[in-house]
Regions:
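N-terminal beta-alpha supersecondary unit
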Residues: 1-62
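A short glycine/serine-rich beta->alpha loop
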Residues: 25-31, 64-68, 166-171
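Oxyanion-binding and handling regions
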Residues: 1-22, 91-209
């Protein structure tokens, strides 16, 4: 089964074409403000370079946030449009779950965190021993998050691509797309119109209404 994976929830483009869990081609590139203008071009180039087109794809896996509001919208728009036009099943996964799946789980706990500004993050705490989130995904202050982390001891890995105001050492997030796909590919696909952004927090404009 050929699978198209897409994550534009940060200032990076993470995308790949896979045959089941084997990566055929992938892009892991920091695009910053060029993400909106270059993402689709890079994706089209990836398909072209591998002599493939969207008709070859049988499943789409898209990251639906949290993260950059603009980035999340870009990825969901691309994935939903392809899914609808080509009638391809689509699976959504949160960015925090993708980060957790890509972590080095030799530690007891994994803490994926995404900068939400003003000393807040989108974060969760995953128990690698019992295989469950003990702190669900949420918008949380760094101080509150790290107070919870201190209660768990030192066997923790903190993952982020952002510069956070913390004394903890941070492991850079580099997605293991093959492993992410392996863990989610058998989930039931949904109608593209049912795919929702997982913002966890309203935009400032919405908060001020």
């Amino acid at each position: 089964m050929k699978i198209f994976y897409l994550d534009t929830s940060s200032n990076y483009l993470y995308t790949a074409i896979l045959e089941d869990t084997k990566v055929i081609s992938e892009i892991k590139e920091k695009l910053d403000r060029d993400l909106s203008s270059l993402a689709l071009f890079k994706i089209e180039e990836m398909f072209k370079n591998n002599n493939m087109n969207l008709n070859d794809i049988e499943k789409i896996i898209v990251v639906n946030g949290p993260g950059s509001f603009t980035g999340v919208r870009i990825g969901l728009t691309i994935a939903k449009t392809i899914s609808w036009a080509k009638k391809i099943p689509i699976i959504q996964i949160s960015s925090l779950e993708a980060m957790t799946l890509s972590s080095n789980n030799k530690y007891n706990y994994t803490v994926p965190a995404i900068d939400a500004r003003r000393n807040y993050v989108f974060a969760a705490v995953y128990d690698n021993v019992n295989k469950n989130f003990i702190l669900k995904e949420q918008y949380i202050s760094i101080n509150t998050l790290e107070a919870a982390m201190r209660n768990l001891g030192d066997d923790i890995t903190y993952i982020s691509n952002d510069k956070l105001n913390t004394k903890y050492s941070i492991q850079e997030y580099v997605p293991n797309i093959s492993y992410i796909v392996e863990n989610v590919m058998n989930r039931e696909g949904i109608n593209p119109h049912s795919v929702d952004a997982n913002y966890l927090k309203m935009t400032e404009a919405e908060e001020n209404l």
